[in-house]
Amino acid sequence: MKIQSLLPVLLLCAASANAADNIRIEYMPAETTHDKLAEQSIQSSDLNPIFVRLSQAYFPFRKPLTLIYGGEDGPMYDPDTHTIHIPYTFYLESLNYFSNNQYEDRYGKSPKTGALDTLLHTLLHEAGHAYIVDQSIPVLGKEEDAVDNFATILLIDYLDDGADMAISAADMFAFESDDRPDYYDFGEYIDEHSFDLQRYFSTLCLVYGSDPEQYKSLLDEVEKDYLRDRKDFCQYNYENIRTNWQHYLQHNDPKNSEKPSSSPNAMTN
């Protein structure tokens, strides 16, 4: 049995207002026309209900989490207030990247779809930080990489079409990388985040590893000398990361659990 993609209106309202007393969702006043567009696009999508249902099913918080849209900070998680901040500008910038890169012409997905897919991946990334704090999960290595994996594994394993949504998020990393100069400042080499292009390939690696047959051409950008080795690694890496995160997720076996339906694409345009 699969959870239906478009939830009843009453349930949508309840999820946004109460989030089952586990996640509180707030919208700061949208001050510009563009901010109002972003607010409307987010509110009219299935994104927040999907996020809430995933949390309820797989990573429930002991302490209620607050998600705030708007403002200037973020995307970020503030551990002092147990709050995720997502500015409207993040959605708008993502929308511009997907539009400017002719996403619909190249891949058959609208810029809005790409931007909302990216936003869901980002919400799950920030929720990963929150879950680590909430559950006192030890992290060996870069926490930013760990929560990138958290977000991607949740999409792949627990959402219909989630792998396709993860690919959209990966493409956003590639667009941001293309928009950078050809060099990095020294300080960026000790930044908490991996480089955008690394995040792009790491995300694609997990998607490929989850189903090598379906995504057999996904890593074709990799040079032929490395391709077979990388494909083997990605299959191992997906299983390893998935197994590690399942120690901390509820309903550990995704193959025998319900999937909340996908996509923030079942959205009002």
Model-based region annotation:
Residues 2-9:
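Sec-dependent signal peptide recognition
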Residues 10-19:
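Hydrophobic h-region of N-terminal signal peptides that target proteins for export
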Residues 22-24, 185-269:
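Pan-zinc metallopeptidase signature
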Residues 31-40, 134-150:
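Active-site metal-coordination segments of metallo-dependent hydrolases
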Residues 40-102, 106, 112-116:
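Auxiliary, metal-adjacent structural segments of Zn-dependent hydrolase domains
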Residues 52, 56, 60, 128-136, ...:
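Sec-exported extracytoplasmic/periplasmic mature domains
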Residues 86, 121-134, 144, 148-152:
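Active-site recognition of the HExxH zinc-binding catalytic motif
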Residues 142-180:
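Post-HExxH zinc-binding segment in Zn-dependent metallohydrolases
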